[in-house]
């Protein structure tokens, strides 16, 4: 009996409890199960956008972790981010309540579906969203479980009416290799999650299994602009692989004639599929998001659309319908004719891609790039310390905050201040500064922002919440400064604040 079919019978699973339900991956699976008719609840340490959204659907949310939260539950779902000393896990073990990993629950939802699994070190969320848009434009309405909020839908997960399921496949703990996908996407492979894998070669091996575990009739889509992915593809002969890139001249799908601005990217595509005679050119594809990395993400979606015979019109329409993903180069405010961007970038390669996009736009506007970065996890900074020192070259001015721990214990010698100090000592950046308090961002913007500037706030921690409050904070600061002038009338601002 399949989980997707169980509700059609008289059988019941009881209550399914998610520990860390506010996480983007966990909230998506919980939402799908709720929409399928299952009783779902969950707990998290703090309230956030995801917990509020789930509560609005009638899902019970506990703030804080306590053993009484799972008093009447039948199953407990966890992710690798949940520690074994969590009181709810301890209680579940004591009472022998089945504990299910997030990837196992995702795999169950994907069983007997034609599933597209999107993996890679970076770009998964945007690529998943783009593929979903193409499916809908082709008249196929998939179930989607994404790692970020899709702006078109205001959610990261939704039920579809077709037999397709598109999911972001998280590689952080190797459980993604057990996902029963028909189509597998690899956007790139970089040293990441080494606290789990310990060795980069083990991580690469997991991606190899991700492809070779496909059924013989499935296929993979891989970006061979990335040298690690190219080597992996060259070593695999037992599965069909469609390749894409911008620089790789031998890729099956290549973007060229590229133009990008602050709001969009336009490019042409050359398609030369294996075992298909001739070459197809698609002209003037436009995606409403800037950046070379997003063009690569689009090529992955095009590869799926071409292989499934969506047609050129559906592909173009799908991209036209794409409204972006929350926290992926998202404009949150303007100040003094400078644009303030919120971005999820927290790995050196993501930071380089985001800043390269910002630099390209700033150059067109005769502006500068001001980067404010909140490091995420002590272990990530430790393993990639040298890479972090080198990834901010496109920032004209750089501020680095304290590390957002994300539940980790501090590591001696690994701090935001030490990163800035090493960058300065090694002359990797001559305008790198340490920012002790996020509140000081307001002063940084007021002091430095000028017309044409791109102010990029990056990180996977709480810097996003701060970025989304900047409009209010900057306005409050202006009122405070202006109120010192006795001739200044602040009444016009009162309505804005309220």
Curated annotation (Swiss-Prot):
Binding locations of ATP: 120-126
Enzymatic class: ligase
Single GO term (MF): ATP binding
Name under which the protein is recorded: UDP-N-acetylmuramate--L-alanine ligase
Protein family (similarity comment): Belongs to the MurCDEF family.
Locations listed in the record: Cytoplasm
Taxonomic lineage from the root: Bacteria, Pseudomonadati, Pseudomonadota, Alphaproteobacteria, Rickettsiales
GO biological process: cell division; cell wall organization; peptidoglycan biosynthetic process; regulation of cell shape
